[in-house]
Structure formats: C-alpha cells, structure tokens
Amino acid sequence: MGNEEAFTFALAMATGSFANMVLRAVVELDVFEIMKRAGPGTHLSAAEIAAHLPTKNPDANAMLDRMLRVLAGYEVLSCSNRSLPNGQVERLYGLSPVSQFFTKSEDGASLAPLCLLNQDKVYWESWYHLKDAVLDGGIAFNRAHNLTLYEYAGIDDRFNKVFNDGMSGCSTTIMKKMVENYKGFEGVSTLVDVAGGIGKNLNMIISKYPTIKGINFDLPHVIKDAPRCRGVENIGGDMFISVPQGDAIFIKWICCDWNDEHCLKFLKNCYAALPDHGKVILYEFIFPKASETSYAARVILNIDAVTLATVVGGRIRTEAEFEALAKGAGFEGFKMAYSTSEVDAVMEFLKKK
C-alpha cells in the first residue's frame, strides 16, 4: 500500500462510523421497504422516496439524497443519473444485493434490526468506556450502565425488545440456511434450545422436523416475550444452575458471550442433562483460517470487538478452542459438522463417542 492510499484508508477509518449512523437513519425511515414496494429493479429519486415519509420538511429531499449517496458509495444501494428538462441531473437509487438483506424476507427476517441494535444509544455508550476498561479493568458496558448487559436488558423493556429483535432478525437469516442443509436434527426426540431467546430458532427447526418436542429455555425476562407455538414449551431459568433434559441441546451464539470458565459451567450442565447418546449442537462464530483482512475476517473481528466491550470475558474462538471446551466439559466426541459461511460453524459435542 502506497503512502497516498494509506492516507486515504486512514481517513476512511477515521470517518467510517458516519456511514453506520446514516444506515441507521435510513432503516428508521423505512427507506429500504419503500424502495422494495416500488417493485424489482425500480430506481427512485430521493424526492420520490421522501413522498412516502411523514414529513413537511422542505429540506427532506436534499437531506435524504445526500444520505442515500453515502450508502451508494458503500454499494449498499445502486445509483444512476437521470437528466431533467431544466438541464439538471437527478440521482436515482435502487436496491443492491447488499440492501436486499435490510428488507424483510418472506418470513420477516432482516438485518435492519441488527443495525438498530448495534447503533443503539445503550450499546453505543459502551465504546466511550472501552479505554477506561483497558486501563482500570472491567467491562465497558458495565462501566457505562453499572449493570451487565443482561441485567440492563432485564430492566429496560425498550432495549430488551431492541436486543431481541436485533438478534432474532440476524439469526433467522442465518438459521434458514442452516436448517435447510444441516442434517443433525434427524432422529432427535426432545431438543432444548439453551438461551433460545423468543424461540425463533426452535420454531424454524421444528417446522422442518415436526416430530421433535421443543423446549425453549432462557432467562425469565426473555421468555416472557416468547410467543406460544405448537410443539414448543417455553421455560424460564438459568443455564448456570441447570438445563432442561433432552436428547439434544442446541446452543447458538452463546459461547461468544462468556469466558472459558462460564462456558464450561453451562456446558457441564448440558452434559448432565443429556443421555449417553446425547449431543450438544453448537452454532457459533469462528475465526476463519484465511487472511484476517478478508471481508469475512473483518466481520468476525468486529463481532469480537463488540463482545470485548459488552460482555464479561466474551470472545470469538478458533476450532481448537471449541474442541478444548468440549473436552473440558466432559464430552468424549467433537466434530465440525457444517458451516453456512466463512465466519460460522456448526459443531457437535458428543457425550459418548
């Protein structure tokens, strides 16, 4: 990288958070859904989009155009020009392959709620305390709010919903591919989803495997928002104390929230809840073996940074580190079962080989 390119890259890093905040505002304004309703391949001007917004602000068109231009620069939107009769040029915007993921799929899934979560004031405040956490110890989120992330979610209904929506929206997008391709749920009688949130993961699994009895297990303040679904029992509790019994236990994106000591504690509880032929099906982000400057690696590094700022001892692990957790919790078998992308993996912890 030459000096000029390095300087430009440094500027991009110094200003990079602005684009994320523009993206958040565009999501809040429902712009992507407005564009989607216009039909496939349609390109709209900022004025045409703004006409669907509840605003009388005379500057809204110009402001929105500048925001959409930012997203086009990041290839979140496509952009073309249209010549007007008065000789001026008007920019037209369309959905790109990237922005499709910020619109709702047939099952209502979208990455838009994850964007709102990651730029939420409650989350964002953590970053202002990261320096002090490095110097003086502690967790940035805890220093900002005097509570852990999960304690805070338990007392703030607004943030609890933002958190659950952000997790479930992203989860549904990824889980759909996993359920279609991973075959390890075949033959399972009772499946316990530990820290299953509001139950979307379990519902997707049972929709394909209707003979499975599902148990959605999470903290009581999370379970209270879980809808009732056929074939699923919602149980409130604490995975660090005990876990409901089943012949398979599903855990997704939980180990990344905890240090090894805490992971071993709930994994040992899972071990105790399983019969000899049982298994834990662990779906986690994992450090890719490829270059750490790839898009996939940057996603994982960003997620690792979030866990650093918000949870006690949380981090992204390597395959070898997951195998060490399995063996440390007493499981005799470990295997990499399936991967939906470069950044995640489905692993099986087998109680007995």
From Swiss-Prot:
GO terms for biological process: methylation. Homodimer. It comes from Lophophora williamsii. Optimum pH is 9. The gene is NMT. S-adenosyl-L-methionine binds at D218. The keyword Methyltransferase applies. It comes from the Eukaryota. Expressed at high levels in all tissues. Keywords: Alkaloid metabolism, Methyltransferase, S-adenosyl-L-methionine, Transferase. Belongs to the class I-like SAM-binding methyltransferase superfamily. Cation-independent O-methyltransferase family. This is N-methyltransferase. Gene3D superfamilies: Vaccinia Virus protein VP39, Winged helix-like DNA-binding domain superfamily/Winged helix DNA-binding domain. S-adenosyl-L-homocysteine binds at S171, A195, D218, D238, K252. GO terms for molecular function: O-methyltransferase activity; protein dimerization activity. N-methyltransferase participating in the biosynthesis of natural products derived from phenylethylamine, including mescaline, a natural hallucinogen potentially used in psychotherapeutic treatments. Catalyzes the N-methylation of many substrates, including 3-methoxytyramine, 5-hydroxy-3,4-dimethoxyphenethylamine, 4-hydroxy-3,5-dimethoxyphenethylamine, tyramine and mescaline. It catalyses: 3-methoxytyramine + S-adenosyl-L-methionine = N-methyl-3-methoxytyramine + S-adenosyl-L-homocysteine + H(+); mescaline + S-adenosyl-L-methionine = N-methylmescaline + S-adenosyl-L-homocysteine + H(+); tyramine + S-adenosyl-L-methionine = N-methyltyramine + S-adenosyl-L-homocysteine + H(+); 4-hydroxy-3,5-dimethoxyphenethylamine + S-adenosyl-L-methionine = N-methyl-4-hydroxy-3,5-dimethoxyphenethylamine + S-adenosyl-L-homocysteine + H(+). Its EC number is 2.1.1.27. Disulfide bonds: none annotated. Pfam families: Dimerisation, Methyltransf_2. Optimum temperature is 45 degrees Celsius. Pathway: Aromatic compound metabolism; Alkaloid biosynthesis.
